[in-house]
Amino acid sequence: MRFVPAVCLALLASLSFAAQARMVQRPVEWTLDGTQFKSVLVYDDASHAKRPGLVMVPNWYGINGTAIKKAEMIAGKDYVILLTDMYGENTRPQPGHADQAKAATAPLYTNRAVMRKRIDEALAQLKAQAANAPIDTSKLAAIGFCFGGTAVLDLARSGADVAAVVSFHGGLGTDDPALAKNIKARVLAMNGADDKGTMPDADKFMDEMRGSSADWQFVVLGNAVHCFTETEENSPGCKYDPRAAARSYRLMHDWLHAAFSGTP
């Protein structure tokens, strides 16, 4: 009689193990204007339930192990994330080599139309993944960090049909403030109060948003500098701040939930 409980316990353990999260990392490739891009689709395949899809643009170092871990953390059981390659598969700045990252981002900062075209294409590619990933295409959004924050704000300015965009310590400036009239998404921008790189553009950004019909929020996180969500950064002007990071992630989840559910 003691054998039966043992078998039951073993069966329950095996079922529990099978139900555990398994984060999928699947390459997604496309060509745009002669450049080959290689992004990564990230999601938990323990469940086949459809969930919102997010375009995620990492910081200026682009796709690397740290960015993938962050995408997995955010995706959890809640989202399917397309971690987006904005440079092309042959351009991969090495972490810590700011000169390489600066060279990679320069053409996109110089020509914002190209930046918008590339992230618009990333959104189209995310939608296409619904054929073989559990994406609810009625619930799409974009999030970005540092350079990626700039990119997702430009996605909103392009008039993309997404429910929301969320920018973490992203650049706030634009080449054309009039584009704000195109915004359909709810816009959440979060920046550190002591971020010397982005905060000088804060007033212009708010004026830009006021001149649009967008539903927007601009959150200033006290005592935080640039890079406050970037766990590997620890320099005076670009430093991880666990308190600001945790608060910003809570704000992100709340913003996305409200946007997807149509609540204020």
Label each PLM-derived region with a short phrase.
Residues 161-171:
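A conserved short beta-strand
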Residues 70, 199-209:
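Short alpha-helix in the alpha/beta-hydrolase fold that links the catalytic acid
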Residues 132-145:
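Alpha/beta-hydrolase fold nucleophile elbow
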Residues 183, 189-191:
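Short beta-strand/loop motif that positions the catalytic acidic residue
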Residues 144-148, 152:
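Gly/Ala-rich beta-loop-alpha elbow adjacent to hydrolase catalytic centers
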Residues 194-198:
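Acidic catalytic loop of the alpha/beta-hydrolase fold
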Residues 210, 215-264:
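C-terminal catalytic histidine-bearing segment of alpha/beta-hydrolase fold enzymes
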Residues 27-135, 229-234:
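Serine-hydrolase catalytic machinery in alpha/beta-hydrolase-like enzymes
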